[in-house]
Every structure is written in structure tokens, then in C-alpha cells.
Amino acid sequence: MLHHIFQKLLLPAVLAGTMLADTVAPAVSLAAQAATQPDSYHDDWLHVNDNAEIVDKDGNPVWITGCNWFGYNVGSQVFDGVWSQNMHDMLRQIADHGFNFLRIPMSTEILLQWKNGDPDPATPKVNQYTNPELTEEGIEGGTIKYSFDIWNMAVKWCRELGIKIMIDIHSAETASAGHQISLWYTDKFSTEDWCDALAWFADYYKDDDTILAIDLKNEPHGTADVKDQMAKWDDSTDPTNWKYAAETCAARVLEKNPELLVMVEGTEVYPKEGYDWTAPRIDYTTMTEYYYGTWWGGNFRGAKKYPIDLGKYQSQLVYSPHDYGPLVWEQKWFYDGFTQETLLKDCWYDNWFFLQDEGVAPLLMGEWGGFMDGGKNEQWMTYLRDFMIENRIHHTFWCFNENSGDTGGLVYDNFGKWDEEKYALVKPALWQDDNGKFISLDHTIALGANGISLSDYYGSGNSSTTAPDSKIIAGDVNSDKLVNGVDLTLMRQNITKWQSTEDVLTASPQDTNGNGVFSVADIVLLTQYLLGKDVTLKSYTS
């Protein structure tokens, strides 16, 4: 998932190098130039306070509300979509739509390539006619730049647009299916390689607070069916112990830049009471399951007994679960009639929400999203969105890309158009002030064309503990603060499924006539309202 406006002068033209026959000049650290950089390159670092809140340098709570944009991890050597659209313009659109943070999947392999100055294994997938800025000559149809040069242009543009960045190691090896590998190492790239890559990256950008965070590894997972490929969470130093690996790598990263936020994801499984990691996944004679299972990277049950310990860097720790809906996988908690309350009871609380609820550490939902199906998947997205708003859970929506097979994206038509219906669902969960201005995580740079800076927000008298709007607008089914034909369509889709169910009887936007029941009469009333008839919709305060 990208945005900016010019004031904080760009990073000194990093790596404006050119590709030679077989080699590229090694990446040079920016540390030597730190003395000449303005203080505004170091004033946006974030940390965690004693209340498990992410706060800025002045102790003001912030809300990270971003999206994911992949490509570097799959072999494109650039963001996907730059093969057709202008990269700068897409970043500008992301900023203008209110996303203040980008989670960008990478691989250990590409970071080590950049660290060593190795040539691109393939030409970056850039349309040099729509992206003349990404060519050596700066002209349409020119020679495409080295991928690290292009990356640094993206960092520069994000800074100018007010977007902050977090990379994640999506996989050790660059591959479109790399995320299927359960661990952070392979036969080709070791745990040490992974640590080296992230330590180099942290050091390289330690004087640029555009890079605010690192997500150490995407979705550690695996089950007891293949024990040597199962990410576990305990107090051992075993090579597959994710807790130990995360603490080790985080120490390397924070030694280079102690100001970075470090995101630690969960595992897939954790042993049930009375069992340990030696247990099989299931006893097929009795069909007894010995592990609690959930989404890849979404299981933090181990952190209750074995919390992540970053020592003197504990203030930089954020736990980062992932959560998805039934169109990704029909999990057992997606039974008929599931609600936000049943999801919290059956999945969310014991797997991850306890960490924030008990004040252990803040949460950033690193991936959530899916197709707009007018049914169960959309219900799940709405429930999770509302839960994150209510509890101020940080998040990065999956994803900007249209080419995510499990979920689709925020754009379509070869990255050329926005899915306005999906964006309307996400928009209420983006950080905004009372006037609907999107809030940047940068103290001096506003977020895109429709936002304000962090200093503008707190300087205008906004409370650091601003609560979400509790007013429920009748007819605003998708919670975008508008009542229009999209809401009418959703009500028509929901009528058969939701009529007379308990969770729409109180303070429901679908109960437009205020009689406590969602029925065809509510759809008729909304239709009349949209046609300009002299009718009144009932609103509530929750």
C-alpha cells in the first residue's frame, strides 16, 4: 500500500548510480550526510508509552491507518501496476484518499541485492512511456533505472506526500508464492541473511523518518504435520522458534536505529492446554485436535506466557496480527449468524486482542481486506473495521493492488480506477479530524491534497484522545457518513439474510423508520428519501 508534499527537501539524491555491464555501485550509507539534513528528518519517530499507545515525540497518540502495496517481493523489482500507470501519480492518489502509511512487502533476497549493489535479475516492470521519471534519460521510452534508484524515488515522493513507510519481509526468496513458505529462512537464505538484510536497511535509512517501521516477517506459520517447517512460540532457542528469532533480529535492527517501530507477527498454531509442541496436529482415531489454529501470523497465544522481550528497546514493540474473511478461508467461526461479538469470543480476543486490552502492547492489523460480496465476507469486513475504529487499532488494509487473488484491491482496470464501494467501506477507518481532513503522521507535511499535518491537528486544539463518532446515521449502511444508492443496494441484499435478527434491532442504520425492526418498510422509506420525497430517517446515538 503512499503519499506527499514538498517542504522536507528530498534525501540527498541517493544512489543516482547507473547500471554498468554486470555490476552496480554498492549502496552507500546516508549516515555521513546526517549533519546536513534538516531536523525534520528526525522529528516523526514513534514509540509506545506506558498505556500501550503509539505516540509521537511529544507524547501525542497517533493512529496509523494505511494500506499494502506489493510488487518488490514477487519479482517485479518495483510496485506492481507501474507496468501500466505512473508511480508518482498512484502514490499521490493513495495520499489523497487518506492513507497515511504504506506497508510494502519485500524479500530478504532483494534487500541483499541492494546491499551488495548486485544488478537486477530482470528489468523492473516499469512502463517507461507512462513513467519517464523512472528512466535514466528522464524521457518517454528511455532506459529503465536500477530498482534501488526507483525505490528511493518512491521514498522521496512518499515524504513529499506525507506518507510514512513500513517494509515487511514477505519471504526469504523473491517469488510470487514466496509467502507460502512458512519460515523466515530457506536453503538459499539463512536466518543470519535475514538479520543482515534488515540491519542494513535500518542503518541505511536511520536518518530518514519516512521509514518509520519494519515488520520483521510476514505470516510465520506451519502445523505439526511438518514439524521442521512449523513456526512455534516458546522459550527455546530452536531454529523454528519465532519468538527467539524475532527478538534476535529486532535487536540487530534496533541497534542500527533505535527509533524504528518493530512489528512482530504471530504464528498459525499454539498447543492446547496439557500439550506441547511435540504433539501431533490431530489424533485421527478420535479426531482430537491438539492445537489452537487461526490465520497465518494471527496467533499470539504464546505471548501470554512468553511475551516478546526487546530489553531496552521495549518501547518500540508492536504486535501485528492478520485477519481475513470467509472468502479467503471458511474458518469455523464464520457459522451462520456470526456477529462482531461472536468473532471477538471465538477468534479475536484470545488470539490477539488480549494484548491491547490488557495493556501489554499496541496492535497493528497488518492485513485485512477482501472482496465486496454483499454477504458474509462484507459483514466480516464491516465488523472488523468497526472494532478497529472503536478500539483505535492501527491497521494497513490489504491491499492497493488489484492483482491479489484472495481479496482483490482498492483499484481495478489495470490499476487505473478506484473501487469506490470498497473504498467507502475502508474510509471511516482512516484517521480524520472533525472536518474530514486526513491526518498525516508527519509533523510538518500534510497528507496529500485532502489532509493536514500532525502539528496542524494537535495545534488546532484536538484532543489526544478523540473518540470515534458515536452517532449512527439511519440509512448509512456502509458507515461512510453518506446516505446514497450504495446503501440502498446493501439493504436490498441484506433483507432476506438479516430480517428479524437480533443484531439489527438496536441502533441499526438499516432501521430507517426507527421501529426496532429491519424490514421492507425501511427499504421503501430509504427509497422515498433518495427520490426526494418529504420523509424523515431516524438516527441514533450508540
Q: Where do the protein language model's features map onto the residues?
A:
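Sec-dependent N-terminal signal peptides of Gram-positive bacterial secreted proteins and lipoproteins
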Residues: 2-28
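Extracellular glycoside hydrolase catalytic/binding regions
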Residues: 83, 185, 195-212, 217-391
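Aromatic-rich peripheral "rim/lid" segments of glycoside hydrolase catalytic domains that contact
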Residues: 375-470
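Cellulosome-associated attachment modules in secreted, modular CAZymes
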Residues: 21, 25-31, 464-542
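Structural recognition of the beta-strand scaffold that forms the well-ordered cores
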Residues: 62-69, 100-106, 110, 164-171, ...
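N-terminal carbohydrate-binding accessory modules
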Residues: 30-103, 114-134, 141, 467
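Surface-exposed, active-site-proximal loop segments in enzymatic domains
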Residues: 75-81, 110-146, 175-189, 225-232, ...
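Aromatic-lined carbohydrate-binding surfaces of glycoside hydrolases
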Residues: 106-114, 151-155, 160, 164-184, ...
